[in-house]
């Protein structure tokens, strides 16, 4: 794990240093291109550090979930907008299929829900080749009451999200390792596609904190489906539904 983390941190750091040196050497060249590359590398480094901090907070029991009003379609649209660039760059089609009748005015931690979906979509983009497809599907079901649940029965909903890809797939013997901390399928995959191996672990921990469940189905050379289900409470006096899903992203 330490070797993989060191490699992942070193890569964006090298990028930051290299482009900073180029910007200094080529004084007559507009620095925007180098600054953009430095910014991208800095963001990649920040993501790694944030993952490490999240794991540390969760394992120490110091991470608290917010309970605030949010719109589910805003969360999904933001994720797909951010993921769209990398998907298009890789020649991948990104499609969103959101049940038009599901409730979208919810109460919960929108930031952490967005983090879960973003991790799953980013992972799918990483392991799907040119000409492939990723489909984000959201459905709604009935949620059973939880201990100390203050949400009235008529406002309880179960949000189910599927992220399907036509990527490389995962062998059955590795499926049980995917959501474990500091575990990856194999080192060669890590080197080819990058990543610390913390993203799926964080997804599992966040979903469990939300009293939900997460699972995966996969077949080598066919693709994978990562899915999770969490109970949420709808906002009072709100009948807002996803009349139109976020626009499908075409390459």
Where are these regions (language model features)?
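Glycine-rich ATP-binding loops of the HATPase_c
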Residues: 211-217
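Conserved catalytic submotifs in the C-terminal HATPase_c
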Residues: 66-71, 88, 93-104, 141
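Primarily the dimerization/phosphotransfer
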Residues: 1-25, 43
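Helix-loop junction within the histidine kinase core
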Residues: 56-67
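ATPase catalytic-site recognition across NTP-hydrolyzing enzymes
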Residues: 176-180
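Short alpha-helical segment of the dimerization/phosphotransfer core of two-component systems
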Residues: 40-48
């Amino acid at each position: 794990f330490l070797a993989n983390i060191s490699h992942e941190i070193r890569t964006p750091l090298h990028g930051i240093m290299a482009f900073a040196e180029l910007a200094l050497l080529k004084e007559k060249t507009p620095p925007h291109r180098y600054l953009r590359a430095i910014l991208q590398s800095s963001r990649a480094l920040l993501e790694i550090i944030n993952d490490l901090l999240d794991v540390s907070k969760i394992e120490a029991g110091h991470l608290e979930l917010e309970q605030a009003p949010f719109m589910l379609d805003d969360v999904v649209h933001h994720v797909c907008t951010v993921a769209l660039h990398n998907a298009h760059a890789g020649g991948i089609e990104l499609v969103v299929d959101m049940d038009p009748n599901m409730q979208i005015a919810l109460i919960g931690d929108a930031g952490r829900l967005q983090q879960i979906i973003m991790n799953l979509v980013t992972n799918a983009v990483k392991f799907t080749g040119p000409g492939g497809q990723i489909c984000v599907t959201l459905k709604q079901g009935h949620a059973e009451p939880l201990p100390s649940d203050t949400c009235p029965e008529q406002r309880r909903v179960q949000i189910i999200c599927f992220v399907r890809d036509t990527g490389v797939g995962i062998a059955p013997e590795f499926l049980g390792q995917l959501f474990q901390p500091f575990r990856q399928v194999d080192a060669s995959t890590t080197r080819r596609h990058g990543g610390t191996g913390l993203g799926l672990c964080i997804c599992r921990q966040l979903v469990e904190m939300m009293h939900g469940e997460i699972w995966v189905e996969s077949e080598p050379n066919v693709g994978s489906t990562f899915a999770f289900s969490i109970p949420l409470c709808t906002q009072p006096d709100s009948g807002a539904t996803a009349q139109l899903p976020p626009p499908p992203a075409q390459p």
